[in-house]
Amino acid sequence: MASILVDDQTKEHDTIKDMFFIFEIDGEDYGVEVTNVIEIIPMKNITKVPKMPDFIEGIINLRGDLIGILNVRKRFGKVPKEYDEQTCIVIIEYDQYKLGLIVDSVKAARPIPPQNVSPPPNAKLNNYNQFIRNIGKVDNSVKLLLDLDRFLEQ
């Protein structure tokens, strides 16, 4: 799988404002603001770090940068699955840190205009609902938009 890069010029362009990078976990579509995504890489060997929470898989060396790797499935409390050819790592930058998110598969960057975004229902339907900031409606489907602040809290 080739790396997909989001360069600084693209990040600053006005059309990027309502763009979300969509990925899949357990058959459901999730999104993060495309401005947080640096690149997508294939799975790599991950060095385990002792005494870390279960959802933190460890670290990788990416071109000289040490990147912490989080398993999104485990963070959501979902059943782990074997990595396959679709499994990849989405490298994000958040609060001046680079992190990697292991996802089942990547889809694409999609525009979701503000009028198609609404807050999630108040009811906690599952144990990962706390990580959802908004729900985006795209065509006839729903994209669950992550709240990175809550998702990255320990």
For the regions a language model picked out, list residue spans one by one.
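An acidic, low-aromatic, low-complexity terminal/linker signal
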Residues: 1-154
